[in-house]
Design a protein with these regions (language model features):
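Bacterial Sec-dependent N-terminal signal peptides
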Residues: 1-25
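Mature catalytic domains of secreted/periplasmic carbohydrate-active enzymes
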Residues: 24-162
Length: 162
């Protein structure tokens, strides 16, 4: 009897949680600015997604740390060797714009927690943890603004180290 009661409570609790989430989703009304941004994004048709970070050094994909069961502390040491000496935001943006792309989406931080920008919330970033010491996002944003191309950001809240 006790097992049936606990099962019943779990089912009721789950159904209430699901119905409240469905209600929250159905009551969302995007604002004018949001709708305009969606339309603009749709009209742009073609953009380039730059998925770049420490994982590029291993040339095995952005999920390499978890897919290969790499120790986080060992993986984090990659930052000490990250020095993209040929990175030139102006050249990158010019080449992307010449391709006909209307926007760039850039991975500012992926699941391993490494940020491609300077942040006060973590020292595990391109400015504080690498010999490169330059804010890649800042440089990319300046080049996009100068050359008139939209810049969107991908930022992962997931963090394999936390």
């Amino acid at each position: 009897m006790k097992t049936h009661f606990i099962t019943f409570l779990l089912l009721v609790g789950m159904s209430l949680g699901i119905s409240s989430r469905l209600h929250a989703q159905s009551s969302y009304q995007p604002g004018e600015e949001n709708l305009k941004a969606r339309e603009e994004f749709q009209d742009n048709k073609f953009g380039i997604f730059l998925h770049w970070g420490l994982y590029a050094m291993l040339a095995t994909g952005e999920w390499t740390m978890t897919n290969n069961n790499l120790n986080y502390k060992e993986y984090a040491k990659l930052a000490g060797g990250f020095y993209p000496s040929k990175f030139d935001a102006d050249k990158w943006v010019a080449a992307i714009k010449a391709s006909g792309a209307k926007y760039i989406c850039f991975t500012t931080r992926h699941h391993e927690g490494f940020s491609m920008f300077d942040t006060k919330y973590s020292d595990y970033n391109v400015v504080k943890a690498t010999p490169f010491k330059r804010d890649i996002v800042k440089e990319l944003a300046a080049a996009c603004a100068k050359q008139g191309i939209k810049l969107h950001f991908y930022y992962s809240h997931l963090d394999w180290a936390r």
